Amino acid sequence: MNSFKWGKKIILFCLIVSLMGGIGVSCSFNKIKDSVKQKIDSMGDKGTYGVSASHPLAVEEGMKVLKNGGSAVDAAIVVSYVLGVVELHASGIGGGGGMLIISKDKETFIDYRETTPYFTGNQKPHIGVPGFVAGMEYIHDNYGSLPMGELLQPAINYAEKGFKVDDSLTMRLDLAKPRIYSDKLSIFYPNGEPIETGETLIQTDLARTLKKIQKEGAKGFYEGGVARAISKTAKISLEDIKGYKVEVRKPVKGNYMGYDVYTAPPPFSGVTLLQMLKLAEKKEVYKDVDHTATYMSKMEEISRIAYQDRKKNLGDPNYVNMDPNKMVSDKYISTMKNENGDALSEAEHESTTHFVIIDRDGTVVSSTNTLSNFFGTGKYTAGFFLNNQLQNFGSEGFNSYEPGKRSRTFMAPTVLKKDGETIGIGSPGGNRIPQILTPILDKYTHGKGSLQDIINEYRFTFEKNTAYTEIQLSSEVKNELSRKGLNVKKKVSPAFFGGVQALIKDERDNVITGAGDGRRNGTWKSNK
């Protein structure tokens, strides 16, 4: 299979750098493992730690927390808030997300997705009650160790003092201008045009809101002036905003290629990802990895099967009776194996962000946050954009609109463990997330190469009866896919194909390596 390289940056701690032609660079797993023997920082040899995220400033701030003795959870709160400032188009306090936490003594998933309001009158809103701030507070109060005010400070600094805009944000503002531009967004569109790459973006209103949260906790967001601003802009009642609740769920757990897999429970799509992985294993899809058309068509087949099962059986567990662990059992997968599945049709915006953190104690955080679409609805209040998550509901079935409900999402933060190896991985990409992650893990677990090299390879995804590819396929491959019932279209948008972030800890060598996706400015660092 052909591969392409992106690249612009040189990442610290890499002796040999993998160059990729886009934005962002990460180190090759094999090269760093074999060649880089660095001394641990001033904390001594008490363990290794690392951060993988879609913006270098978020990685830097997360590493500072870990270096100073903070936990993976502490660093995750910092990274989440910083991404909401410096990658504000993909996530933020006006949205929500989910966080998978796997440690030696706990396995938990925190769901802080946006919810539908109860009090809407005759209208059906597009904006859900934001869950991000409540989620961060719950995670801190139950799993964090450092003071919350301290964890908020880096994000406040970047909002108040500013940061250098990268070309990803400039491009996103340019593409979104017809949809979101207004005079209220002059800090993003000085003189009516997107702020240029390299310019400093200062977000005074956001800094003010973050300081209010720092001082008053989540109450400063869900009550008072910020809540009134949300209510006025989003047409959501103050009762709905104040009444937001975080959900704590058990991760879905299964086995794949000898790995124990922990992944996000419904209404997230860890079930779908794990089903696809297990179907790929049972159908021995990897045998055809070097035959492009066959490999693609088999991946499309298992996508159809798993997505159909998702559509029929998954939804908000507060509204739908289901057993997600049963749905990833070997017995259940065997019943799915011979199904055909419907054409892939359920849509979801690709505009999310993912990060992974591993601390000295081996605790892994794999988290995906979102506004749904880039910049959400485009509606802006109190310094942040409001989500458009409610557009992800369907008209009928388990994903139909109901008050207080969370819509289904394709997000699937995941952790895999086997023989002293721990992998934290995930991606943005909307309805393509399981399709993006499955071939990557299929190739990695079969030893095709380093995780970074596999992430660098060109991708393909499917929707309805069309295969979307990053490169132009040969006429021979396209003709073969056509005979299998698939049209082929080249898609020029890198963000369309996700932004996989990952870390791998090898406990035998006490080394952390990682992978970052140049499609979305991805990078990573470790102390060893």
Swiss-Prot record:
E.C. number(s) listed in UniProt: 2.3.2.-
Matching InterPro entries: GGT_bact, GGT_ssub, Ntn_hydrolases_N
Keywords on record: Capsule biogenesis/degradation, Hydrolase, Plasmid, Protease, Signal, Transferase, Virulence, Zymogen
Binding site for poly-gamma-D-glutamate: T352, G429, G430, N431, R432, R520
Domain of life assignment: Bacteria
SUPFAM superfamilies from the UniProt entry: N-terminal nucleophile aminohydrolases (Ntn hydrolases)
Signal sequence bounds: 1-26
The record's account of how the chain is modified after translation: Cleaved by autocatalysis into a large and a small subunit.
Recorded metabolic or biological pathway in which this protein acts: Capsule biogenesis; capsule polysaccharide biosynthesis
Inducing or repressing factors: Capsule synthesis is transcriptionally regulated by AtxA, AcpA and AcpB.
GO process terms (BP): capsule polysaccharide biosynthetic process; proteolysis
Phenotypic consequence of R520A: Abolishes enzyme activity
Single GO molecular function: transferase activity
Active site: residue positions: T352
Family: Belongs to the gamma-glutamyltransferase family.
Function: Transpeptidase that cleaves the poly-gamma-D-glutamate capsule and catalyzes the formation of an amide bond with the side-chain amino group of meso-diaminopimelic acid (m-DAP) in the peptidoglycan scaffold. Degradation of the high-molecular weight capsule (H-capsule) to the lower-molecular weight capsule (L-capsule), which is released from the bacterial cell surface. The production of L-capsule is essential to mediate escape from host defenses.
Subunit structure: This enzyme consists of two polypeptide chains, which are synthesized in precursor form from a single polypeptide.
Protein name: Capsule biosynthesis protein CapD proenzyme
Species: Bacillus anthracis
